[in-house]
């Protein structure tokens, strides 16, 4: 880049700002556009598909209109860039007061990153948009996460082995981490597994003492004990997260919710592999369709949808809380008409959680306040409807909804019903709410009549009946006369000559224009002042309105779970502090949709805590394993479950080792990943955990695999004593583990008919003697010759005393079978 003195004052100012925010694309405000220069312009031009031009002779340049900048900023952020927004902080007139040649002052007012978005247009309404932070002190890790658009703020202490599941559960848009931690091999593997923007800082940024000062400063307390009981590593994570938010908002932080500690004992910990294998939020291929959330999310509000996802990410581990939710779901199942009325009222309910955040950040628009007024009106209607019920759950929600009629009345009196997204032009405040505004409105309303009177006067004066008075942004008001006429009156001053017309002005027209423009300007300023006062009043009530928003979201979730229960014939499970796990005629909540699903029982209660399932591939072993884990998850969020009867003792952790998860990018083979995941289960499971293991020990030599599988089953049975379902293709395993007192054996029922194998997907007691692998190979499209060859080898192996004693088997005969 050339020497700075070679550039214009504007470009020198741009370069000085760019040096401060080198990691960001700098959007530099010039009038009604945001401009980008140099390499930033090249990047933005390609990313946004906008024209790349030049300023001067060789400076790359492109720009986007100010009024539509949000969408462009969103596209840049989604493409992985951070965006520094540079605004003019004074007018050209104010700059000239300092000096005739003074450059307008500009400052970066905000840095836009994936985790700090608050604008609706840049966010997915039904998805939580978390900014997360991981800090580290010794062997403890602090995980803090915030949704800036709603104010949600949580933290918890964790261990290295739990970080994968923590990030998987949260799915943050952006993760803040130290340079040192980022470079650790163990952390590098975790980060590669998740798709989110990574922002790293040096180690001192995460210093716990520094973080404590930030926390105390933001919340106005002298000690963090005033906020709650936090571990040092939690303080580090929270304070560092807040400091980063303060940096991106350029010091402008509204009143934020206190960080709440998520105690590990308060929710069911679902490990990372289980979150992926159970497909709670997306399928293995990344699609939402086919996931559990896609099946049960019948919510009718964005807030409810986000709350339901939080329920699934953090299933409750307290049977009293679970039973309270179940009571509410059962109430709505039994009161269908009320349920439908409530859902009708809240359908399309404005996303006031995010609106309130924009109010607190002073980034709300007239449209936001109009939507807030509509929401308060719906809350009033909702309160009136549910007040007829005396049910304890409804009474609690009614209290949370509160009474906002005074604020609703104020909004109705002040705001006009329009969808203005910017405030500078006015036109959104009811003139009747302010005497001066009403007077200014009359002046503006009368301006058309006054202009018309002046036009008629000038037509009479000049004798030109086609004379017009028009206006544009360049000239303001002007008199236009056809070129075929000559105006001789000296009061008419020529302003512009065109091919077919001449434009004039007069002192009288200038005076009238000044009155109109002055009224418009004063009116816009006054509207902005009134709007600011209204927003300040709303900000004072944000906490109460926030409670109402949460109550609406909760109503949405509870009525949704009731609707799903009725539509899909779910039953209320018994959830208590026992170690029971008994499911009668359970079904897979996702697979059963649109199919004739075969229901099966599962009993892992005390004395029968482990089930070992054998059977061929495609018989339904993996589906059975997953369905019972999903039933457990549903039970722990307070939902009814797909079964005829269910009794589940509270689970502390759910572990899953199901399906291949080979990840070449991580440098691990399928078998290595399987062993790592199995080791985590054996080390972390407890007697209150639920473990599902599918085909443990495959991917290595038979003796190795069988030994590993037997050792894993023995460890779970004797040491962790977890409730467990294991599926295996080792037919020796049931015989070798038959002496375990708490194990039972099942297989999937198969029938052979006319030489074909029929999978009945029915679980029955017993041990499968065959795998039917050759039949599955045929279904998969094996060439006929290869299939016949496989049958030949199998017959030879069956003739041997033991299928691993193959030295005496002649496999050379019949090799020349060809496909037909």
Swiss-Prot record:
GO cellular component: cytosol
Keywords tagged on the record: ATP-binding, DNA damage, DNA repair, DNA-binding, Nucleotide-binding
Record: residues binding ATP: 615-622
Designated name of the protein: DNA mismatch repair protein MutS
Family per record: Belongs to the DNA mismatch repair MutS family.
Lineage: superkingdom: Bacteria
Keyword Nucleus on entry: no
Pfam family name, one: MutS_V
SMART domains tied to this protein: MUTSac, MUTSd
InterPro entries hit by this protein: DNA_mismatch_repair_MutS, DNA_mismatch_repair_MutS-lik_N, DNA_mismatch_repair_MutS/MSH, DNA_mismatch_repair_MutS_C, DNA_mismatch_repair_MutS_clamp, DNA_mismatch_repair_MutS_core, DNA_mismatch_repair_MutS_N, DNA_mismatch_repair_MutS_sf
UniProt cross-references to Gene3D superfamilies, sorted A to Z: 1.10.1420.10, DNA repair protein MutS, domain I, MutS, connector domain, P-loop containing nucleotide triphosphate hydrolases
GO biological process, one term: mismatch repair
Function: This protein is involved in the repair of mismatches in DNA. It is possible that it carries out the mismatch recognition step. This protein has a weak ATPase activity.
SUPFAM superfamilies: DNA repair protein MutS, domain I, DNA repair protein MutS, domain II, DNA repair protein MutS, domain III, P-loop containing nucleoside triphosphate hydrolases
MF terms (GO), sorted A to Z: ATP binding; ATP-dependent DNA damage sensor activity; damaged DNA binding; mismatched DNA binding
